Amino acid sequence: DGGMSAQMNQYFSYFLLHFFRDMDLYQQQQPLKQWKVQPFRPASSFRVGILGMGQLGAKLASHLQSYGFDVAGWSRSKKQLPGVTSYAGANELEPFLSRTDALCCLLPLTPDTLGILNRKNMGQLPKGAVVLNAGRGEHLVADDLLALLDENHLRGAVLDVFKPEPLPADHGLWLHPKVMMTPHSSAQSEHVPCVERIG
């Protein structure tokens, strides 16, 4: 994969640790000059769910276990990965979402996955969950995400892909305080490894 899986692991690890260690809350406290330690929680209580268990998703699932997180994956068919709870198909999407504190989307774009990050599905996540999308911009219904953030159902979102790209300057995602954005840079092809693989 030309080093893309390692980059993707780094990307998701950075942001998942950001939320797990309550860095977003500390950032909110700082301008208010609040000295408040957030309660400790074990890593095993942080339930990560990966939408899309292809090559990148499977490698991410294995990598995240090193932090002690409770990792599950959802895909079209059951996957067998040590230490990862597997969900598959439309009937198991709701139970997968309802147990997920941090949803990581790495799905391919198909007619079945178009708009999968919508109000109905994201609303099945527990209150205070976070959504991270590095799949495709078309997976996300942006207005639904913004509404769930404003209603405080979702704690935050990390977005690397958008529809369209680049995102228009007047889009509501840009300045939302609970949204962190990157310009489709979660994983980039490394020229040398790709050339070596082809040659």
Regions found by a protein language model. Give the residues of each.
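Short beta->alpha connector loops at strand-helix junctions that form conserved
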Residues: D1-G3, G135, H184
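Glycine-rich NAD(P)-binding loop of Rossmann-like domains
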Residues: Y26-K59, S86
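Phosphate/diphosphate ligand-binding glycine-rich loop within oxidoreductases
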Residues: D1-Q27
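Adenosine-phosphate binding glycine-rich loop
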Residues: L167-P168, L175-G199
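Gly/Ala-rich phosphate-binding loop of Rossmann-like dinucleotide-binding domains
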Residues: A61, Q65, L149-D150
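NAD(P)-binding Rossmann-fold cofactor-contacting core
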Residues: S66-G83
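Rossmann-fold NAD(P)-dependent oxidoreductase module
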Residues: Y11, F15, K59, H63, ...
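Rossmann-like adenosine-cofactor binding region
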Residues: K78-G172
